[in-house]
A protein has these predicted regions:
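Structural/interface elements that position substrates and couple domains in central-metabolism enzymes
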Residues: 1-440
Length: 440
């Protein structure tokens, strides 16, 4: 099938590359000419396991092309995916200016039947707005061209996006006609060889499904962090509590890992957008409000532990960071917990030396005015530091040489924001070890 993807960010590039890998003819379009030139030269702007190899392979065999011209995409495509950003506005509402700009360009240049697919995460009712914009532009040109706007939200996990796309646990399609459903069924059929995981519904329900899914996952994270805070105060161990509740099949273990808060491009933005949607429609979402406020508070928890340990005086202290990205296997720094913690430490007069396997360069863009030094490896970050903080649970941090850590640190102190280590073993090594949800 001939496919166009507008936007070469995280969602757009993964989608375009994976569709090309499955034998489709794909053209990815972006207004950023530097990004397009970089992609043509084999430089992938985001880190995602397996993505660079697919982009390189498909570009070389001609199944994947890159362009800055939407007219080229419209001449090519039977199906066009809108995968541009929907940043959060000052009021918490998703900003649709990029989505609607693409819709306007489609209407201005469309000359043949087309399925337009909203792949971006958009508020309920966006599909109708996109349809209106395209239709209005076609009327200005006195054209009656067949098109349909379909919703096909993405459910990709950063760090496992390629595998998620190629082996989806479900594909949600929101359409308004059998034409839309049939085209999307044909497109996704190669991904459904073992099980039919296509779920068809109306457009608004598909749009809502994305927000509901992310908000549910965020709720689980905030819930276990709430429990963790209670555990610390009553003397319980949240790690054991997690096992006790996770073994219940009705609950499960997914997303009930206590930590220093969720981040990334999806959960914070989508929870806030759903809160805004609810309020716009006369409903106060008390549970979602609590999910959001708990997460904001959770991002301070590690700072409070560090601050209290040093008696409220952090001036001149050096804190070593292991991990900066909002989660492992990505270089994404959007809404990362490390950003909140580093800012608080900086305000308190502390210095930071950080190491992340993939996100250090990206982190520099988010903290241009903060005095953060970046180490070349995890052990070098520790040299002479007053304490170590683990923020991102990269696999290379799982089984470190604790004697090496102890020798390099000024004080044998670890603040663990992801509860990765064995407290008893660390105590035997002479460490003071602080976790989330466990009284020190």
């Amino acid at each position: 099938m001939k496919i166009a993807v507008i936007g070469t960010g995280y969602v757009g590039l993964v989608s375009g590359a994976c569709f090309a890998k499955m034998g489709n003819s794909v053209i990815c379009v972006d207004v950023d000419s530097k990004k397009i030139e970089a992609l043509k030269n084999g430089v992938v702007p985001i880190y995602e396991p397996g993505l660079a190899d697919i982009v390189s392979e498909c570009y070389k065999n001609g199944s994947l092309k890159f362009s800055t011209q939407i007219t080229e995409a419209l001449e090519h495509a039977d199906v066009l995916f809108i995968a541009v950003g929907t940043p959060m506005g000052a009021d918490g509402q998703a900003d649709l200016k990029y989505v609607l700009s693409v819709a306007k360009s489609i209407g201005e240049n469309l000359n043949k039947p087309l399925i337009v697919v909203d792949k971006s995460t958009v508020p309920v009712g966006t599909g109708a707005k996109v349809h209106e914009v395209i239709e209005a532009e076609l009327k200005k040109r006195n054209l009656d061209v067949k098109f349909e706007v379909v919703s096909n939200p993405e459910f990709l996990k950063e760090g496992a996006a390629v595998e998620d796309f190629l082996k989806p646990d479900r594909v949600v399609i929101g359409a308004s006609s059998e034409w839309g459903f049939s085209v999307m069924r044909e497109l996704y059929e190669p991904f459904m060889k073992n099980h039919d995981r296509l779920i068809c519904m109306d457009v608004k329900s598909a749009e809502m499904t994305k927000y509901a899914a992310n908000s549910m996952l965020a709720t689980k994270i905030s819930f276990i962090n709430e429990i963790a805070n209670i555990c610390e105060r009553v003397g319980a161990d949240v790690n054991l509590v997690r096992k006790g509740i996770g073994s219940d099949s009705r609950i499960g273990y997914s997303f009930i890992y206590p930590g220093c808060g969720y981040g990334g491009s999806c959960f914070p933005k989508d929870v806030e957008a759903l809160i805004h949607t609810a309020r716009q429609n006369g409903f106060e979402p008390e549970l979602l409000n609590a999910v959001e406020s708990r997460n904001k508070a959770q991002k301070r928890v590690l700072f409070d532990k560090i601050y209290n340990f040093f008696g409220g005086d952090l001036k001149g202290k050096t804190i070593a960071f292991w991990g900066l990205a909002f989660k492992p296997n990505t270089d994404d720094m959007r809404e990362a917990s490390s950003l909140t913690l580093i800012k608080l430490l900086d305000e308190a007069g502390a210095k930071v030396v950080a190491y992340d396997p993939k996100a250090s360069e990206e982190a520099k863009k988010y903290m241009p005015n903060l005095d953060v030094k970046y180490a070349k490896n995890k052990y070098d970050a520790l040299n002479g530091a007053d304490a170590m903080v683990l923020v991102t649970e990269w696999s290379e941090f799982r089984s470190p040489d604790f004697m090496e850590i102890k020798e390099r640190l000024k004080n044998a102190v670890i603040f663990d924001g992801r509860n990765q280590y064995n407290a008893k073993a660390l105590a035997e090594h002479g460490f003071k070890y602080f976790q989330i949800g466990v009284k020190a």
